[in-house]
C-alpha cells in the first residue's frame, strides 16, 4: 500500500505542491479507504486541492503535540489564526497587523500585549508553523522583523487549507469541556460494539506511539494484542515492512531498516547516539539491580539522579562528540537528552521523578571501543 505509506508520512498531500503524488494517491483512495476505516476508524478527506488521512491517537500522550510550540498560549494563538482564516477566501491576502489585531481581541482582559518581546516571538513561531504546513503563504516582507518591532508589516495569502487542519467531530464540540469528553465522543456511536472500539484503539496506538505498555494484568488492550497478535502483524505488514515484537508487558511495531514511514528513531544525529548510550546504560543498571522494575517492567528514578548519571555517561564519551556538543557542557547536553527521550515517549516526567518506560530496555547502543582507543592514541 504505497499510497497509504505516503499518507502516513505527511500531514496531507497538496495538489499544488506535488501534483503527481496527489494523482497517484487519489487513484488509490478507494482501495485503502475501507482498510483504514475498518482497522483504525480513520477518515480520508479528498478535495480538489488536497488529500488527508486523519491520524487520531488511541491515547493522548504527553509527548504528542506540535513540536515547534513551547507554550499553551501558542496553541491558543494558532486556533485564533485558524478562526481568522475562516473568514478569508482562498488566495485572499491580508496584512500582519490585521491578524495581530484579531488575535488581541480574542484574548480576554488584555492577556496579549504585543509590546512584550516574548509574546511577539510566540506569534512568530506560530506563523512559521503555519507557513511550514502551507495554510498561509508569504507574499511580501517577513515575520522575523515582528520580533524586533511590533509595527513591522508583512503580506500573507490564505491558501484555503486551514479549514482541514482541525479534525471532523461526530458531535457538537460545544458539549466538550475536557479531554475525557473528547475520548468519549470519539467512539460514542459504537458503544454497542466494544470489540471494534478496542481494535481501532490498539491499531492507532501501534501506529502513532513508540510502543504499547501493559497497565496491569487485566489491561484489555494487551489482552486483545495477545489474542490477535498474528492478525495485527499481518495487517501492519500490508502497510509497511515491519514486525510486531511482543513481550510480557509491552509490544512494538519494529520497522525494517529501509522503511522511512513517520518519525524514525534513531536519527542520524549526535543526540540520538547519546540517547542510545543512555538507554544501554539504564539497561545495565536494571540488570545489576541498581534500578528495580515493577510487574509492568517500568522503572522510577529521581530526576536529579538520572541527570547525574547522564552527565557521567556524556563525560565518558566526550571524545566521540562534535565540538559543538563538547563546548555545550555536560549539563546542557544532559537536559537535551532528557527532553529528546521525553519527546519520543521513552520516559515520562512525574513531578521530580522520571518514569522509564519498557522501550528503554528494547534498544540501546554505544560508541566503538576500538575507535575510542585510536582517538586516545
Task: List each language-model region with its residue ranges.
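Eukaryotic partner-binding/assembly regions in large regulatory complexes
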Residues: 1-67, 145-266
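Short amphipathic alpha-helical interaction segments
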Residues: 27-35, 113-132, 326-340
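Short acidic, hydrophobic short linear motifs in intrinsically disordered regions
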Residues: 4-21, 90-112, 203-219, 292-325
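Positively charged, polyanion-binding regions of nucleic-acid-associated proteins
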Residues: 9-10, 72-93, 272-300
